[in-house]
């Protein structure tokens, strides 16, 4: 992605590379950057965002960055790589920041500036690894050799464990105090007004740096294991009860039979 380097205008001394690129900075040591924007922005561009390359324009419009100060000659005092940096490097300042930032990008980052495929690929890899681990745990839990765990069954189990439904979210929040203003994410403790917002946060929170989807999947896998354990206990105790009912019937008839000792 983009490489950001901070250019300080007030405070610590400015590096020699920045001074060689912007010689007017020494004469305008101000706390804000409007003066630098006047000297750096070319007069041909009607707005700062128009001077950016197309990939940076989409990033600025998407992130809401305004009052952008640019410099077409971002050579940074390097004669060997000056042409490369002049093509791939720009400078801008967000409206909420007292600093200006160098943005240097290569061809790979230009291709990734629109859809962020790395994040989607990492998310897909993480999801696939997690579902495969769950499927392996399910297959290893069956001890009988006749249970071969076919692929269709594992695909169904993966789909059931991967999908987080509204019932799963409400079940996870059952042990927490009831919220009156909305729905609370059990993983990150953030509040959302509706259940749909919470579901979209769990589904797409990986792009924002949250791992709530992984937490809910682990929780759902634990629930499935507990449910299987309880079902096994009921079957083991139900074998005795199944034999008790005909024994009681025989006792009523007059015979004595103890089928479950």
From Swiss-Prot:
It is found in: Nucleus membrane. InterPro entries: Spt46-like. The keyword Membrane applies. Residues 140-159 are annotated as: Disordered. GO terms for biological process: cell differentiation; fertilization; fusion of sperm to egg plasma membrane involved in single fertilization; spermatogenesis. Testis-specific. It comes from the Eukaryota. One of its GO terms (cellular component) is nuclear membrane. Keywords: Differentiation, Membrane, Nucleus, Spermatogenesis. The keyword Nucleus applies. Transmembrane segments: none annotated. Plays a role in spermiogenesis and fertilization. This is Spermatogenesis-associated protein 46. The gene is SPATA46.
């Amino acid at each position: 992605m983009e490489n950001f380097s901070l250019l300080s205008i007030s405070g610590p001394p400015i590096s020699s590379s920045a001074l060689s690129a912007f010689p007017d900075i020494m004469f305008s040591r101000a706390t804000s950057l409007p003066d630098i924007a006047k000297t750096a922005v070319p007069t041909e561009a009607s707005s700062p965002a128009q001077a950016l390359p197309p990939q940076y324009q989409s990033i600025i419009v998407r992130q809401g960055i305004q009052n952008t100060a640019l410099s077409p000659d971002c050579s940074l005092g390097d004669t060997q790589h000056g042409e490369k940096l002049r093509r791939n490097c720009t400078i801008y300042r967000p409206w909420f920041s007292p600093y200006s930032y160098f943005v240097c990008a290569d061809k790979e980052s230009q291709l990734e500036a629109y859809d962020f495929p790395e994040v989607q690929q990492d998310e897909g890899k993480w999801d696939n690894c997690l579902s495969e681990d769950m499927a392996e745990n399910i297959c290893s839990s069956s001890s009988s050799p006749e249970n071969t765990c076919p692929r269709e069954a594992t695909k169904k189990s993966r789909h059931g464990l991967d999908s987080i439904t509204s019932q799963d979210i409400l079940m996870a929040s059952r042990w927490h105090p009831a919220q009156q203003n909305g729905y609370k994410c059990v993983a990150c403790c953030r509040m959302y007004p509706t259940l749909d917002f919470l579901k979209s946060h769990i589904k797409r929170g990986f792009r924002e740096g949250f791992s709530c989807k992984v937490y809910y999947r682990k929780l759902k896998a634990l629930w499935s294991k507990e449910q299987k354990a309880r079902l096994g206990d009921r079957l083991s105790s139900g074998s005795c009860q199944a034999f008790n009912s005909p024994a009681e019937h025989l006792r009523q008839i007059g015979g004595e039979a103890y089928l479950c000792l």
